[in-house]
Regions:
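Intracellular juxtamembrane helix-capping segments at the cytosolic ends
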Residues: 111-125, 322-337
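Cytoplasmic helix-loop-helix junction between adjacent transmembrane helices
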Residues: 101-138
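Helix-loop-helix hairpin linking two adjacent transmembrane segments in secondary transporters
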Residues: 127, 132-189
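Conserved MFS/SLC helix-loop-helix module at the cytosolic interface between two early adjacent transmembrane helices
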Residues: 57-96
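Helix-to-loop junctions at the C-terminal end of transmembrane segments
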Residues: 58-71, 270-282, 365
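Central cavity-lining transmembrane alpha-helices of secondary-active solute carriers
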Residues: 46-64, 261-273
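Extracytoplasmic gate region of multi-pass secondary transporters
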Residues: 26-27, 213-261, 268-271
Length: 392
């Protein structure tokens, strides 16, 4: 009976990872909004930056909240906020509507990322945590690479779009979010008392202080910066890859949307194969191989002008960046096992890199073309290479 319950819980958690991938629609969505509202790069990049801004604000409070209400209830709340975020764009595409929708999408994803990863540790712990988190990222990547296709099909009327064009993406993902919510609601997940009540007698202010104090540990701080670089490269490639194809190959946005899908296809392949490689290959070696792939990718994206070189470069960064988050996150959780909720909050706060990188990349690309954006991402890749010596 226990195995059956654990299997059901694991399935529900994996569907939540799929819902977590909804946030990656912001990359292709911002390109369509840029086209429809005639925005420049710096203004259009406000949308992905806004989504990830909320990781800075809500990650640590979510970690504290988990101590009060538990991990499962926090994930349920995140799904509710995400569903509302996906509902709003159905009714219009004004700048303000999109700002509100992307803000709520960012808040919901902050709650989800902070609580879902520790929930996985509740369902599957021990040596299988990193590989299970990687498999969750594989499921998440499926939602990520489907988004550009669904948006393009809606824009070209290849599928019924109900008069809203590319925005048909939102109601489709909203329906899946509702299914994920119901499945998790009816799944029994036993949480240890220490995971939900520990620290409840302390004041909220003291819990915040204890959480931020963890950044005083060198490994936690280095991991925090590593997460910032990972997500900066992720969001940066998501938004910049189509622009590179448009700039250098002179293709339309609908055709360039394939670049985002290609990135997430190889991220998906990377997560899936990484699930197995992490069981047989040393974590540090696999991390170094992944970062070297990204370094090669940055070189290709910086100087490449042919379709083959650009596609290979996008594939390399997709595969290389696919397992970085899981490796860093698992290392951080295992470094401070008695403070997993707090560490999770700090690591997810590092996703604020998804705000910092696109803003700098937007300014760089307006000044230097898309090569400027690639240089910004390359700085993040170089940091990850220096971080690799800390991976155990």
């Amino acid at each position: 009976m226990s195995n059956k319950i654990n299997t059901r819980a694991l399935i529900s958690v994996m569907l939540c990872f799929f819902a977590m991938g909804f946030v990656d629609l912001v990359g292709i969505a911002s390109n369509y909004v840029k086209k429809d509202l005639m925005l420049n790069d710096a203004t259009a990049n406000i949308f992905p930056s806004l989504v990830f801004f909320w990781f800075l604000i809500f990650s640590v409070p979510t970690g504290v909240m988990m101590n009060k209400i538990g991990r499962k209830k926090t994930v349920m709340l995140s799904l509710l906020v995400t569903i509302v975020a996906l509902l709003i764009p159905i009714f219009g595409e004004s700048f303000m509507i999109m700002l509100i929708a992307f803000s709520l999408l960012g808040i919901g994803n902050t709650l989800m990322q902070t609580s879902l990863n520790p929930l996985v540790a509740t369902v599957v712990g021990g040596n299988h945590l990193a590989s299970t988190l990687t498999f969750g990222q594989f499921v998440k990547a499926i939602a990520s690479f489907m988004a550009p296709y669904i948006a393009a099909w809606g824009a070209t009327q290849a599928i019924p779009s109900f008069g809203i064009g590319w925005r048909v993406l939102f109601p489709i993902y909203m329906a899946i979010g509702i299914v994920a919510s119901l499945l998790l609601l009816f799944s029994h997940i036993h949480e240890e008392k220490s995971a939900t009540v520990q620290g409840s007698s302390a004041t909220v202010g003291r819990q915040f202080a204890e959480c931020f104090k963890l950044l005083g540990r060198p490994f936690v701080l280095l991991s925090f910066i590593g997460i910032m670089c990972h997500v900066g490269i992720d969001v940066g490639t998501n938004t910049t890859a189509p622009k590179i194809l448009i700039e250098r190959l002179r293709v339309s946005l609908d055709d360039a949307a394939f670049a985002t899908s290609l990135y997430f296809i190889f991220r998906t392949i990377g997560c899936f194969t990484g699930t197995f490689f992490l069981r047989i290959i040393n974590n540090r070696l696999f991390f170094v191989i992944s970062v070297v792939m990204m370094l090669l990718s940055m070189c290709g994206l910086l100087v490449g002008t042919s379709k083959l070189i650009l596609y290979v470069s996008i594939a390399l960064v997709g595969y290389g960046n696919s397992n970085i988050f899981s490796l860093i996150f698992a290392q951080a959780l295992q470094n401070v096992p008695e403070k997993q909720n707090e560490v999770s909050g700090l690591m997810i706060m590092g996703l604020f890199g998804g705000t910092v990188f696109p803003l700098i990349m937007g300014l760089a690309s307006d000044a230097m073309g898309q090569a400027g954006a690639v240089i910004v991402m390359a700085v993040g890749v170089i940091y990850l290479f220096t971080y690799s010596k800390n991976v155990k």
